[in-house]
């Protein structure tokens, strides 16, 4: 069935069966959530002052069957997440493909935009120019986090 308790899920998100998150730390402590963006140091954690915090999943993100989100995970917009059998990283930047346990560029941002257009058209809607502009702006302001995560992924041996 899956469980996404105490989570915030964006629009047009497609969750594979049994996508699950933890919303409680094993030590019952309050949850820190990674945040990124202009004016913030990379890897900044925001203390939630709460013991029940699920995941933050951006618009147009897709997960495979059996994806496991960590407590307080932050996943950007237009991501593709492939399950590894292990909990996901706590941060996956906008536009990233998480495959084999590492963040990659995948087939690129244009393919993600095409996929978002296909998802909306399947439901008789269209991805407007304004929607595309917002997604492009999000991508632009988070580009440094994306490139850092991809670079780190290239140095990490892939999990089988």
Which residues fall in each region the model found?
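Glycine-rich hexapeptide-repeat left-handed beta-helix
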Residues: 1-153
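Intrinsically disordered, low-complexity serine/proline/glycine/threonine-rich regulatory regions
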Residues: 152-160
